[in-house]
Amino acid sequence: MLEDYYPSTTSYYHGGIDDDLYTAKWGMVMTFLDLNDSSLTPFEGTHFALIGFKSDKGVYINNGRVGAVESPAAIRTQLAKFPWHLGNQVMVYDVGNIDGPNRSLEQLQNSLSKAIKRMCDLNLKPIVLGGGHETAYGHYLGLRQSLSPSDDLAVINMDAHFDLRPYDQTGPNSGTGFRQMFDDAVADKRLFKYFVLGIQEHNNNLFLFDFVAKSKGIQFLTGQDIYQMGHQKVCRAIDRFLEGQERVYLTIDMDCFSVGAAPGVSAIQSLGVDPNLAVLVLQHIAASRKLVGFDVVEVSPPHDIDNHTANLAATFIFYLVQIMAQHS
């Protein structure tokens, strides 16, 4: 039995029910699935599993604005309203949440990793609704556990921050996940391939830039780089990064976008990547056929305005699933 795991029992869709797939919405199509069901066998074809990670403990430790613990429900509510465009050949299963208010951050990350591995064993593409960006390390661990030690797994992070802070003194938090991945790779004698899109110089100290400069597998583009380059050049940079790689894990920190587009985040930004450009870049990553799982993190509903941020996060999920399904 999976620890800290609670299957979904509540629908987030409250509109009319229509049997016609031409007018169906996500909330009408999504089906509940219990990962603890021992009778399940691997699915055939391309299907997705949606799981919430109800933790912002890492945000609290990192002195951020807490509230991301509420985001899985907020994102599901927005996603449920969207039209369904994929017929009956693709399924999105809502498998529930990882939740443990009295559990440590490390315990919850470990529980998430086991749930992710279970999804992969069932041939389901994981979609994780964070939670703080501590979500990423648990998601990454689960993906790695589903692979052999020699298999590659590149990481693309759309984020204003590197999240490569050392954690030997403070312990893990929402700003250390990718340093933990880096350290795991070093211990396993693997190159950590990591590309950050949307870095803001005023949000990252010189130690982090120096660490990146000395690390062979790490690349980044600032938000200003992306603005100047346009989506086509950004996509070419991603292609170069993914050359020779078979798998990529994608994580989207909603603080990559300015407060005008994403007011409800743990760490607001005055500058940020254009969401329209982001959709084009995300679609390009999804079309690569290398994407094995993705998450959206750091939505903080108590700080949101008219669900703008939750809706934007749901929009990214919509387009990623569309393109992954069409290119499967």
Swiss-Prot record:
PROSITE patterns: ARGINASE_2
GO molecular function, one term: formimidoylglutamase activity
Record pathway: Amino-acid degradation; L-histidine degradation into L-glutamate; L-glutamate from N-formimidoyl-L-glutamate (hydrolase route): step 1/1
Binding-site residues for Mn(2+) 1, renumbered to this chain: H133, D159, D163, D253
Residues where Mn(2+) 2 binds: D159, H161, D253, D255
HAMAP family named in the record: Formimidoylglutam
Protein name, UniProt field: Formimidoylglutamase
Organism: Streptococcus pyogenes serotype M12 (strain MGAS2096)
Chain's gene name: hutG
